[in-house]
């Protein structure tokens, strides 16, 4: 699929996401934030730990939980950087999938690619 398809999915899932980062030792950090498009990147507000992790690894994942009754969550991986002017972290999406949730119909595909850059 394409960046346009990703844009459609992000609009459908809304602006509340979980930002997932890891430090240099691989210790995970998860925070609930809002995401907005800034050009071709998704921007989220960032605290100290999220900023540190992104500065260290250059990576972040955003997770939109499945809405009630829906079979898929949206997961977007990408290259990330801290915007020094805004203090936000910007994610340049490199891969996005719809991932089937645990209680969804098992006959549905477990993973649907939205973006594979």
What are these regions (language model features)?
Residues 1-117:
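Binding-site signature for planar aromatic cofactors or substrates
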């Amino acid at each position: 699929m394409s960046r346009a398809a990703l844009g459609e999915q992000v609009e459908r899932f809304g602006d509340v996401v979980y930002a997932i980062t890891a430090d240099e030792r691989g210790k995970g950090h998860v925070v609930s934030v809002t995401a907005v498009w800034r050009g071709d990147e998704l921007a989220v507000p960032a605290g100290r730990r999220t900023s540190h992790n992104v500065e260290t690894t250059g990576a972040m994942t955003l997770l939109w939980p499945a809405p009630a009754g829906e079979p898929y969550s949206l997961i977007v991986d990408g290259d990330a950087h801290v915007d020094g002017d805004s203090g936000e972290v910007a994610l340049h999406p490199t891969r996005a999938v719809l991932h089937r949730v645990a209680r969804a119909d098992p006959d549905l595909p477990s993973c649907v690619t939205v973006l594979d850059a």
